[in-house]
Amino acid sequence: MSVPQDVSIFTAYNANVDAITKLNGETIQKLINEFGEKEIAERIEEYPREIREPIDFVARLIHALRLGKPTAVPLVDESLNSWFDEKFEYELERLGGQAGIIANVLAGLGIKKVIAYTPFLPKRLADLFKEGVLYPTVENGELKLKPIREAYRDEDPLKINRIFEFRKGTKFKFLGESVEVPASGRFIVSARFESISKIETKEELRPFLDDIGKEVDGAIFSGYQGLRLKYSDGKDANYYLRRAKEDIISLKEEDVKVHVELASIQDRKLRKKVITNILPIADSVGIDEAEIAQLLSVLGYRDLADRIFTYNRLEDSILGGMIILDELNFEILQVHTIYYLMYITHRDNPLSEEELMKSLEFGTTLAAARASLGDINRPEDYEIGLKVPFNERSEYVKLRFEEAKTKLRMREYKVVVIPTRLVPNPVLTVGLGDTISAGAFITYVNYLKRH
């Protein structure tokens, strides 16, 4: 399949600086020795859900390393920025945040037009976007699309997320035993300060969203996990979600297909607000299997959610996906997991199952190329992904899917499941789910244009 270059996409809202540190056994051991095994073990028991002091970070990190499990924990105390900057050296800074990552991947692919919007654009962030990415501004009462690197505002706040990458096989001692990290992954300390948590389109740009809609075929929205329930100025999540809905509606009035890339939302109340406000007006929604369970739990399907959390069976995920699609009534659900990708849509979707399959294959191939190279800089880079084999559980995935078809009533749906291409030693792991979603969505939109 070739790169669908005749597609134009708008992405919003979240982009940030990712500062990356590669962890080794020595660094981990130093942290354990500094904070004390007993104190760390006690804090692991308490299981802090956010980082308010350094030991919260160390406890959650050690817990994640023992399980070999990718984890993200919000940092809520802005004053800890200096502690992290003094304690760790960053190997590199790159663009993070779903909207930012997706904009750069699509610009690298050379699609027709990429417009990225984030409410905060300090220079340090703007410089990390690729050439070719445009930013919407208003000049003399008109919409002007400027190269994003030139559109920065010095006074804007900076969001920096710290990513601690760990490798399978890294060893350290904890509580008298030798621990070997069972799988590679990353531990993300995500900045969640109030100054950067107002997810919105700024007032002066809002009247021009329909003009942006005329420029693009599709829009990818993300970043709602950064919202707060309450703000010190009296506003709340409902205020920002109302505005976010208006943004989506403005674009849909111009026949723009809207994809929402969901991310894990720790706060149950906020999760429910985002799910019930935003997802029903989207066309396409991208999630992973943990988020299937979170969605089902919000929608009242606790038993099925628990089954997915506990057993992680494909047939449960398919059943859960069909329920989500029906309850929230959007067009297509896209699920990305480490071993398989899945589309669930209603039977009347204009795309054939073969086209849906090709769309997912484009997504996993693009992600494999990015994992192999570390970045997508030109359309030909996509072809590197074609050399990456499908993962070792491919046959098992196919078998499980065939079994699920015999057990579930799927007549009213089109369900497509494909195995993922898995790079054994990835140069990069951050944002691969977003890359899959972006690749799948642009091919989906491209097929719809043909129909």
From Swiss-Prot:
One of its GO terms (cellular component) is cytoplasm. Pathway: Carbohydrate degradation; glycolysis. Residues 1-450 form the ADPK domain. InterPro entries: ADP_PFK/GK (IPR007666), ADP_PFK/GK_arc (IPR015990), ADP_PFK_arc (IPR011790), Ribokinase-like (IPR029056). Binds 1 Mg(2+) ion per subunit. Signal peptide: none annotated. Keywords: Cytoplasm, Glycolysis, Kinase, Magnesium, Metal-binding, Transferase. Its cofactor is Mg(2+). The active site is at D434. GO terms for biological process: fructose metabolic process; glycolytic process. Pfam families: ADP_PFK_GK. Its EC number is 2.7.1.146. It catalyses: beta-D-fructose 6-phosphate + ADP = beta-D-fructose 1,6-bisphosphate + AMP + H(+). PANTHER family: ADP-DEPENDENT GLUCOKINASE. Catalyzes the phosphorylation of fructose 6-phosphate to fructose 1,6-bisphosphate using ADP as the phosphate donor. This is ADP-specific phosphofructokinase. It comes from Pyrococcus abyssi (strain GE5 / Orsay). The lineage of its organism: Archaea, Methanobacteriati, Methanobacteriota, Thermococci, Thermococcales.
